[in-house]
From Swiss-Prot:
The gene is xyd1. Keywords: NADP, Oxidoreductase. This is D-xylose 1-dehydrogenase (NADP(+)). Belongs to the Gfo/Idh/MocA family. It comes from the Eukaryota. GO terms for molecular function: D-xylose 1-dehydrogenase (NADP+) activity; nucleotide binding. Transmembrane segments: none annotated. NADP-dependent D-xylose dehydrogenase catalyzing the oxydation of D-xylose into D-xylonolactone. Also displays some, albeit lower activity with D-glucose, D-galactose and L-arabinose as substrate. Probably not involved in D-xylose degradation, as it has been shown that H.jecorina assimilates D-xylose via D-xylose reductase and xylitol dehydrogenase, and it is unable to grow on D-xylonic acid as sole carbon source. May play a role in the regeneration of NADP(+) in the presence of D-xylose. It comes from Hypocrea jecorina (strain ATCC 56765 / BCRC 32924 / NRRL 11460 / Rut C-30).
Length: 391
């Protein structure tokens, strides 16, 4: 139980798209629905890169935080003295420049995944946060689910013995009804190289999350081993990857992870009947069911024939029409880290975010996927069109 008043974290929201809307609706949920009595959240500012009117409309969509300041530019947002932490909810292509903008303004940052477009960018963000003594975290929300925490505990306790292999997939059937095209316009963020589009950075980060949190993350700190990577991709007509498979080998630990993603077929057409993730050990396996990014149940299957399915529903706030998506857990982590004076989360340390970016970068290199210099440079430019919105 918390003693005294809960710690309040004041958020500034950078961008007004769908992921920002979902995140903010979770921030507005009563923390009591998830048993959190030590932290709370307040949205104090929202910015669109194009107009304050879009920020005002955003507050109507989330149905709350009506007293929040609304801005028509990102520099105005990061200059707001009332903002404790900036949530960067822009496309992957913008993450490096936008996060640097916030860090250089002295703001703590929660940056959406994929963290950056390149590993060099990720290293630069970490160096900057460390030098300025600011909190920085990649928003891989799945890691903070009670389900994920429990699974890591089961593995660490030896429930399925030594884990030798994790197989994980997140795929969608985005085929157009006509021809060989996908249903996305070429300008859409999912397939547009100018926005760092493609299956790996948007979808593949989730199966890699399961590979890393069950294999790499649980390695002893003094014996961390980054994987060797073998990957293959099929490219879409835009040049972005539509289909990628990544094999991560950890030879010193005798383990292997297989992460796959495609925009041509569903992981599970029936949505929750077959495991999207299989964590396989010497005494059995843990199966995690679709959706890979927001799982609601897992199953422990032992080699002796024992099996147990565990449901892990996400709580909803009855005062907000049952709203509750599961993003509030990562927000709570940010609040607790800042309350306790931590610059990074132990659940997803900076080093691990960098290694994951190195893995994705190498997979994309092997697949022949390239992105424009504007979004791959690791040179911060406050006047970049990614920061100003002036394309």
């Amino acid at each position: 139980m918390a003693s005294g008043n809960p710690y309040t974290l004041k958020w500034g929201i950078m961008a007004t798209g769908g992921i920002a809307e979902t995140f903010c609706k979770d921030l507005l949920c009563n923390p009591a629905i998830r048993g959190a009595d030590d932290v709370r959240h307040e949205i104090v500012a929202v910015a669109s890169s194009s107009s304050s009117k879009r920020a005002e409309e955003f507050l109507q969509r989330i149905d709350g935080a009506f007293d929040a300041k609304t801005y028509g530019s990102y520099p105005e947002l990061v200059a707001d003295p009332n903002v404790d932490i900036v949530y960067v909810a822009t496309p992957h292509s913008h993450h490096f420049q936008n996060t640097m903008l916030a860090l250089e303004a002295g703001k703590n940052v929660l940056c959406e995944k994929a963290f950056t477009v390149t590993a060099a960018q990720a290293r630069k963000l970490v160096e900057t946060a460390k030098a300025k003594k600011l909190f920085l975290m990649e928003a891989v929300w799945t890691r903070y689910f009670p389900l994920s925490i429990k699974i890591r505990e089961l593995i660490a306790a030896g429930e399925i013995g030594t884990v030798f292999r994790t197989i994980a997939d997140l795929s969608i059937n985005a085929n157009s009804e006509q021809g060989q095209a996908l249903k996305f316009a070429d300008s859409h963020r999912m397939v547009n190289p100018d926005l760092a589009g493609g299956a790996t950075l948007d979808l593949g980060v989730y199966p890699l999350t399961w590979v890393f949190q069950t294999l790499y993350h649980l390695q002893p700190e003094e014996d961390k081993e980054a994987p060797t990577v073998v990957a293959s991709s099929n490219k879409y007509t835009t040049g972005a990857d539509e289909n990628t498979a990544i094999i991560c080998s950890f030879p010193r630990h005798n383990s292997i992870g297989i992460a796959s993603t495609t925009m041509r077929a569903d992981t599970d057409p029936e949505k929750d009947t077959i495991p999207a993730v299989r964590i396989q050990g010497s005494k059995g396996e843990i199966q995690v069911f679709f959706p890979t990014y927001r799982p609601l149940k897992y199953k422990v299957v032992k080699t002796n024939g024992e099996a147990q399915t565990v449901d892990c529903p996400i709580p909803g706030d009855p005062a907000r029409k049952g709203s509750g998506h599961g993003m509030f857990w990562e927000a709570d982590e940010c609040a607790r880290c800042l309350r306790d004076g931590k610059l990074e989360s132990a659940t997803l340390p900076w080093k691990e975010s960098i290694v994951i970016m190195e893995t994705m970068e190498e997979a994309l290199r092997q697949g022949g996927v390239t992105y424009p210099e504007l979004i791959t440079t690791d040179v911060y430019d406050p006047k970049s069109p990614l920061n100003t919105g002036n394309q």
